A protein has these predicted regions:
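Short, Lys/Arg-rich, polar N-terminal cytosolic tail immediately upstream
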Residues: 1-19
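A structural signal for multi-pass alpha-helical bundles of membrane permease subunits
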Residues: 16-327
């Protein structure tokens, strides 16, 4: 009888202890969740409302329905729908082209990373040193990288012009502005991919290479039929992360190609990305049309949600392709 009472008391104490630990765990888990709601969830709701309403950033109680003026301003050219002192639609479509162009270069960085990782996987002399050297650009500050490339590409005393013996204005010529941003990205981005691919190579079963060699496969066949399928999950992850980073390019573009006088995104806006356009609209949120109404915040919300949806859809497509390749 006493043994049963003691057992019941022990179980009750364990339940009480578990309940206390459970409550403590929930409290700890809710701390980052609360931060997410405040700093991500709330702005997300405000931006969604801002697509359809005029929102005053300094007074969120002042919200008025805008009859889809934000959508009209973004997608309809100036000659058809004139709201601002500049053609927002023209800037938007140019920013779309440049952003897609920059995002597509992630494929190049992926190929560069794969090529270098393949060479390093053969373990040449100094492989560890080269791996560190290739990774350094990735961990460098974006500000430092941007200043370095501005110094290299400067038309007056820049290293590139000194080597070529020319005086080309790389950072001011509309034909070369976007290429300056792309070159900087290709220089900085592959380091992370190299490390990831090196780890992926190590996880491939060596027995597969031995079996392929027994079957008479040459180096190319082993690479295509063994290595590529083995690193497919890593490739899809890097592609997904790279495309998202490309679509959200801002700091590198803004620092290498600052806004020109009377133009956003450098000369002829050839350094303008969608995120830079959003930043410009928010910074000029007090600018009004001929009726004294500002649609800048609404337009910024429209572009932000467009980027969000495009990035989400592309990520879902790549995720499904990754699952299919794993089957």
């Amino acid at each position: 009888m006493s043994r049963g009472i003691k057992t019941a008391e022990r179980l009750q104490m364990q339940k009480t202890k578990w309940k206390k630990e459970h409550i403590f765990a929930l409290v700890v888990a809710c701390i980052p969740l609360l931060g997410f709601i405040i700093f991500n969830g709330f702005p997300l709701i405000i931006s969604f409302i801002g697509m359809f309403c005029n929102v005053d950033l300094y007074d969120l109680t002042n919200i008025q329905w805008n009859n889809f003026e934000g959508f009209k301003s973004v997608f309809i050219p100036r000659h058809a729908y004139d709201l601002f002192y500049f053609d927002l639609a023209k800037y938007f479509y140019k920013a779309v082209i440049i952003t897609v162009w920059i995002a597509s270069t992630q494929l190049v960085t992926l190929l560069v990373a794969l090529f270098i990782a393949t060479l390093l996987h053969e373990k040449p002399n100094g492989a560890k040193l080269f791996q560190i050297l290739f990774f350094i650009p990735y961990i460098c500050s974006t500000v430092a990288v941007s200043l370095m490339w501005r110094w290299i590409l400067d038309w007056e005393g820049g290293i590139l012009n000194s080597l070529l013996g020319t005086d080309i204005r790389w950072l001011e010529d509309p034909k070369t502005i976007t290429w300056c941003i792309i070159i900087a990205i290709i220089w900085q981005a592959p380091g992370y991919g190299i490390v990831m691919y090196k780890a992926a190579f190590s996880n491939i079963n060596s027995a597969l290479y031995e079996a392929a060699e027994i079957d008479g496969a040459n180096a190319w066949h082993k690479f295509w039929n063994v290595t590529i399928p083995g690193i497919a999950p890593t490739t899809f992850y890097l592609l997904q992360a790279g495309v998202a980073a490309g679509l959200l390019t801002y700091d590198l573009a803004a620092l290498i190609i600052p806004d020109a006088w009377g133009s956003v995104g450098g000369v002829e806006s050839m350094g303008l990305t969608l995120i830079r356009l959003v930043r410009y609209l928010i910074a000029n949120s007090t600018t009004t049309d001929m009726n004294g109404i500002s649609y800048m915040v609404s337009c910024a919300c429209v572009i932000s949600w467009l980027l969000f949806l495009v990035t989400g859809v592309l990520s879902m497509i790549l995720f499904r392709q990754r699952e299919k390749s794993a089957e």
